[in-house]
Amino acid sequence: MRQNCILSILTVLILTTLSDGYENYLYRDYSVRNTYNLYDLVNNPAFLRLNNHEDLMTYEIRTGNQENGYQRAFDPERIETAGVDIFSYKALDEKSALATRIVYETSSLNNLYRSLEKDFYSDYFSYTDTTTGDVSYAGPRLSVIYNREIFSRLLTGLQIDYGIERGLKDVYTKCESISRNINVIWGLGYSSYSGTSLGASVRYFDRQGSYEAVKEITDAIVNTYMGYHIYYPEQPRSTNEKKVYAEGIEIDGQLSKKGFLVPSLKIEIAGGYGAKENSINAGGSSNPVQRGYWIREGGFANSILTYGGKQSKIGLELMAGLKRYHDWASPGDYDVINIENSITDIHYGIKTIIPIQSISLTIGYEAGSEDVNYHEYTVDYVFDEQLSRSLIFTDVDISLNQVMQMHYSVWFSNFEPWFYWNTSSIQTQGIEMGVERLFVFGKIGVSFQMEFWKPNDEMGSIDHFGIAFSFKK
């Protein structure tokens, strides 16, 4: 339902990974819980105008808190986040449209043990020292999308995303970091009057990161990890620096067909292939050396089959997909591979949408498996496992009256994590509630979310809380 889409936007992924927006990842993760339009399938800017028919302006303020009662070695005890999000869409004329988004986010990582990274586990060559302290991050992000119909039903679009973020640790080594990220997508699309749409896009992304750790006390030693088990101790000096250079390219395609086999059936297929390279330099500011270099390449495919329409009583959606990639990493001093990682991820899901007068009830199930073959050759460590996951969810959208809608969600999931979690499985449960009301001047909404992670047979849990306020006109 339309209300469901709006209220989902209002929450804006409060519990997403902290580094999202200041980092670019290959491919994307699909979930049957979400609704995907032509633009969303692969973020093809050529289809932006087909999914937006009215000018729109939204403002959102959100805040979140995560208490890590259960921690990995390099996790903080608590994470506090806050952000402001402004989005605008405007049709310039009958053939072109422009969308912009400005986001400013802050986050505080409290009692972070040794790590000088925002997420130690997201890289094979992470920076640490020997202190525990608080780290604060802040920075803006800007997105601009321009879309135009160049011939009858033939569309093109350009999307540019830019983000910058600064971080500072409050104890020596007083590590200061800055991350600059750019993402550019150019797309073509064709949408026929019969309901068939074809699209292709090319994406280039680039990231540069800089870390500067100042020595003040003798035991504040800086290290560069190579994998998750060994590290290189940097030489004691007044200033240690780390530079990260990453860039990649991805080519995606998509197909959508309404009236597939029967009038109420729609099929959507998306796929892509890409590669990303990362170079890490560390040492003194006058003579940095390469500490590591790693490459990721692979691809994905995803399909969605949707049944529903004006003549149907219920809606049904099936989803299935595959993601596969391979990593190679080598230390800077030697021309050998010391880390190799292969991932094959399969997912599938089903959901049904049942309208009951003024209520829309969605019930769904999702499952998947991640086949991991991770090998560190220097210490001869192998993690070769097939990790399973599952999710059950229910969404309820209620039209209380002509000017007020309410949204309610509850979900339960279980997944088997990587070795650095030190537990065999983690169970999660969450709840989200939101309400939106129409006034003469626009719509005001509020959404609240809670999610709890409980490791198997372990003391403690990870508790997430978030709230968002929005205004739309």
Give names to the regions the model predicted.
Residues 57-61, 100-102, 158-160, 186, ...:
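Membrane-embedded beta-strand positions of outer-membrane beta-barrel proteins
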Residues 230-353:
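Long, internal scaffold/assembly segments composed of regular secondary structure
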Residues 61-67, 104-108, 148, 162-166, ...:
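Transmembrane beta-strands of outer-membrane beta-barrel pores
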Residues 91-95, 149-153, 191-195, 258-262, ...:
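Outer-membrane beta-barrel channels and translocator barrels
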Residues 461-473:
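Outer-membrane beta-barrel "beta-signal"
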Residues 17-110, 123:
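N-terminal, post-signal peptide beta-strand-biased segments of exported outer-membrane/organellar beta-barrel
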Residues 114-126, 203-245, 277-292:
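Short, flexible helix-coil linker/hinge segments at the edges of structured domains or between repeats
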